[in-house]
């Protein structure tokens, strides 16, 4: 059994260092007894040592009809009611179900469990061939294909480097790094926690997962080469060079190669010399070519804007540096004569991504350099001294590559055929010269191409791999970029399209951002962060894109109610309706309005669509956190009849809000005129409602005096990214803070909780549960104070237990309603951890470390059997099965 819960016995550690409360051998010292007393049933039992317990009433089908109690016994904090302090318990049942209805359909049973543990269940939605839009690809000297994936919808990005065989079969993931590397292997990228036996990646961004290089969550570095001698080289903005080993570790002192910059200046812009200033904002593409022996790196494409022009960088400049020598920057190799108003910048020759007189570059075995000269419609060839030695006629050349053995030259010619679309032709030449003519060509490409090319040689077979390219019969929207790689085999005098092992599922989920579970059906809903939702069977893993009438059902977010209905923020846009639907997506009207639509919700986007969450109570009340003005948030509510709930807060402010009141085309009694909770910080995420009607909201704030878990006390990411789930009573509340607009107390008698933020208290708050992350915003790893679109999603079960994901600790913590830690599971692992390739006959995973792998867990969902974790970086859901150290069942007689 793969067990993932950390179990210790010291309760002080449990409460203050973030470790679970159970420890040692847990057993019943008094097994459960069930005694009927008039209209109640008494359940008594006792346990041997401090541990968590769970008490439930089961129906004749062994389904839970009443979640009676769950919590930690023997902790410093008292357990949540109806449990009492101490290891001996007596819990009464009033004969009703969770919703207060009498339970009459017997026979009935009581189940008591102690000592929750967790074990790996399964993966859902994963695909080794889906890892973001490809930003670069190369072939290594081992013949394998190294592919860097990155982009997702609406700025959701996570850098991934995967390795594939020459035939396109998935082999392994190198970035993010494997979990089984030896301590010390990751240098500045991650620290080894010897006590936890786990890696702790450094987190550089709260917007997107980024362990390696800080660019506000955008991994701007691209793969240059892969070899046994140099490992995998990357180049980033302004020529910064990076390296990892072929095992995924960091072979040098750091990920960044210090003292070398693949750029005409080794100075940091803007504190720079004239060249760095001139290229700080440049035009043209940035194209690199590396020599087959890995010694030389060449650059072509960039040139200064007119207002930054300098004689030191003539138009058409080509640069070069020695990678294995003392060079600290690139120097000019040659200058291709070019005109600033040439055909390269006009319709037909212009590229919409970036255009210049000089585009692609490549180096052959002799050190000759091949450059795409779009100004003169040719590929020009220089020797290793920078002397022009030949050319190849080619209209609009964009990309060039040289066969590493035969010296054959492959040229992509690219043409603008409309707004932001480009057609292309591939030509093969056996040599250069003014009279050179293609010996093979291929033109059956889709009309929209953004090509990258890598030449792979496997014995006598030569394959050309393309990213951003599709065949002419591909069913793509006008500006849709292809997800699959495209492969051509060089057959000598012709190219032949090849269908190889590399193939993502046509309808596979590309990004994983938000999650909601359906405990009644053991299903899980996962958003791509924009407007697509996928539904999966938790037991089988089967499922896919949510559809209605055969077409994609667009929705940024949803919650599953206690009644099993779906409460959906629907539509294609980041603003749109909040409505109630059946499991089959049919409307369910409200009695007071005769409509299933509650309201039009004012939203926004940044890193995906900025959906803050929907919550549904047992009585059918619905809550949504949204904006009443840009980046100003509140929680509103609607009753089970569909009418707005009256709150105490923001009454005057909301009635002057355009998106909430003045622009709403509804009768006044249907308009939202007050906040149940508000205002709240813009850094918020997730809403849940318990069986008593209490509201739980995720906020980027921590309790007063909060101390991070051991090892994270000085981690700037933990302190900045991590917030708390705040429990408010049914009456709601507000965040009271001097720096929060429209903050005002409306109930001086309401309970208040102090926070670790000076001058900030939470009115109406009953409890805080710290440890949930990420919350994006300003500060370390953030962008601006309004860049708050990346949020975590906690969950709450019917026992009142909370599951709190944290991307910094790469774990999920389960706590009872009093805040006692029950269990914590998950350790760092990349995609390969516990992944079993379908081609693996022995059924063993690529990497068996750790037991429950998580890379950047942003959300969770409870069911009766499991906790489902949305692992954003690994692009999958991890099902974690819940088990117990002991369980007893008794009949109710």
Q: Predicted regions span which residues?
A:
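Bacterial N-terminal signal peptides that target proteins for export
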Residues: 1-9, 884
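Eukaryotic scaffold repeat domains enriched in small/polar residues
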Residues: 22-893
